[in-house]
UniProtKB/Swiss-Prot annotation:
Induction context: Constitutively expressed during exponential growth. Encoded in an operon with ydiR and ydjA.
Assembly description: BsuMI restriction activity requires YdiR, YdiS and YdjA.
Top EC group: hydrolase
Catalysed conversion reaction: Endonucleolytic cleavage of DNA to give specific double-stranded fragments with terminal 5'-phosphates
Organism whose genome encodes this protein: Bacillus subtilis (strain 168)
GO biological process: DNA restriction-modification system
Transmembrane segments: none
Gene responsible for this protein: ydiS
UniProt-listed Enzyme Commission number(s): 3.1.21.4
SUPFAM superfamilies the record matches: P-loop containing nucleoside triphosphate hydrolases
Keywords from the named record: Endonuclease, Hydrolase, Nuclease, Restriction system
Consequences of knocking out this gene: Not essential; its disruption results in increased transformation by plasmid DNA carrying multiple BsuMI target sequences. Triple deletion ydiO-ydiP-ydiS leads to loss of susceptibility to MspJI, which only digests C-methylated DNA.
Main function: A P subtype restriction enzyme that recognizes the double-stranded sequence 5'-CTCGAG-3'; the cleavage site is unknown.
Molecular function (Gene Ontology), one example: type II site-specific deoxyribonuclease activity
Name of the protein: Type II restriction enzyme BsuMI component YdiS
Amino acid sequence: MEISKQTSDLLLSLEKKKGTLPKFSVLRSIPRNRIIYGAPGTGKSNYLEREVGKIFGDNPYVFTRVTFFPGYTYGQFIGAYKPVPIYKKLSGEEEIFSSNFRDKMENFEPMIDYQFVPGPFIDVLIKALKNRYTNFILIIEEINRANAASVFGDIFQLLDRNKNGESDYPVTFGPDIMNYLARNGIKDEMIKLPSNFFIWATMNNADQGVLPLDTAFKRRWSFEYLELEKYRKAVDSWKLSLRYKGHNKVIMWNDFRDIINKRLKGKVPEDKLLGPFFLKESELWNQNVFKNKLLYYLKEDVFKHNPTIDFLNASTFSELIEKYDGSDNIFTFDIDDSSFVSD
């Protein structure tokens, strides 16, 4: 059975919406595989977004974003066979419409077909191979929240790039992927990542639930550490509302972070410190967010594995919240009155 001409025309019109693609080269010195890492709230995603804008422009067709999470799989990232709804005319004519047909489906019989559905990696790969003079980027947020080596699977070998930015070693995918590539105009028997295919990611070492990247996997990436205070000036005017010894107080967000970070430096890894964007500006006046996000992070993520550090005046999180809501100082040190400001 063949897809109708109406559907084909619709898909063609959607393809044309990508507009005129920018055609320019990127310096070889800019890494094709890149991981930005740093403490929570340092602005890794913001930094990556700025870098993407400077290098790749603002055409949404050239970049794709995906977030890894526990349980994220090869099939989701690369692609897999899935049930796909299609529609047949009730008139009995052998005319089939795909699920991409967006008009109202009246007088059509729904059917289920099984097709290879590409993941974000294959989508970007096809774009890059068919538009060699345009740069494409796949952004992976939180790459170490999933088992990255398992998610990448057989494309792991493609991450080895030569000085021109192309894969050193080609691979042959399974028949389902190779057939899909062929149907989309990619008929090579062996596949390499072209130099115009960039893969950039963010990584947070400090969070619980993240998985370590093995040495062989890390070797294929360029790592860039984002300094804790790189975007300090961006939050200079932010103020934090908190209860201190039974009174509602206001303190500059950067001053509060300095108080916390200075007492933690040298006692915990640097990626456990508070970055400028650990809290959003809109969250700084929300007491529930302060308690359940910032205090919880300090108690459960920072001090749970460092119980000997003299910092919080509570042995459990519930005790910490009770003291915060009451009139006690939750810290084992005093905050100087001169640190507080008017709201």
